[in-house]
From Swiss-Prot:
Motif placement: Gly-cisPro motif, important for rejection of L-amino acids: 137-138
Pfam families found in the cross-reference section: Tyr_Deacylase (PF02580)
UniProt-listed Enzyme Commission number(s): 3.1.1.96
UniProt GO MF annotations: D-tyrosyl-tRNA(Tyr) deacylase activity; Gly-tRNA(Ala) deacylase activity; Ser(Gly)-tRNA(Ala) hydrolase activity; tRNA binding
Gene Ontology biological process terms in this record: D-amino acid catabolic process; tRNA metabolic process
Coiled-coil annotated spans: none
Gene Ontology cellular component terms for the protein in this record: cytoplasm
Keyword tRNA-binding set for record: yes
Name the record gives this protein: D-aminoacyl-tRNA deacylase
Transmembrane segments: none
Highest taxon listed in the record's lineage: Bacteria
Main location: cytoplasm
Assembly description: Homodimer.
Length: 145
């Protein structure tokens, strides 16, 4: 399971000209599901995302996690993160999870974060989305479990 996280000062997702998810300070999480992923990996990755210290403390060091910084999550499904790009000029998605598997783990990821008290907004699974963000830093990390 893969999460590309970006520290943002604001981010939003639009589907059919309607904003369906928006946050101010927090993390935009692009979430990719691979074939071998399961609930255990999902919980490990969600915990890591919420605990990852990417927000600055009073000394300007990245010492604070999402909760300590008072941030929110915007979680967007992104199957292209599971692409194999090693060979050729076209990505292969054979390692990506099935749509059913990905939807289930995506929904569980969001629910897990919410049960931990994190304000969590979402995109729309498998929709054509327009994602707008102001990357704060920029600070971007690729997390994989």
């Amino acid at each position: 399971m893969i999460a590309l996280i970006q520290r943002v000062s604001r981010a939003s997702v639009v589907v059919d000209n309607q904003t369906i998810g928006a946050i101010d300070k927090g993390l935009l999480v692009l979430l990719g599901v691979e074939r071998e992923d399961n609930r255990e990996k999902m919980e490990k990755l969600a915990t890591k995302v919420m605990s990852y210290r990417v927000f600055s403390d009073e000394n300007g060091k990245m010492n604070l996690n999402l909760t300590q910084a008072g941030g929110s999550l915007l979680v967007v499904s992104q199957f292209t993160l599971a692409a194999d790009t090693e060979r050729g000029l076209r990505p292969s998605f054979s390692g990506a999870g099935t749509p059913e598997q990905a939807l289930g783990l995506y929904e569980e990821f969001v629910a897990f974060c919410r049960t931990k008290g994190v304000n969590t907004e979402t995109g729309q699974f498998a929709a054509d989305m327009k994602v707008e963000l102001v990357n704060d830093g920029p600070v971007t990390f690729h997390l994989q479990v």
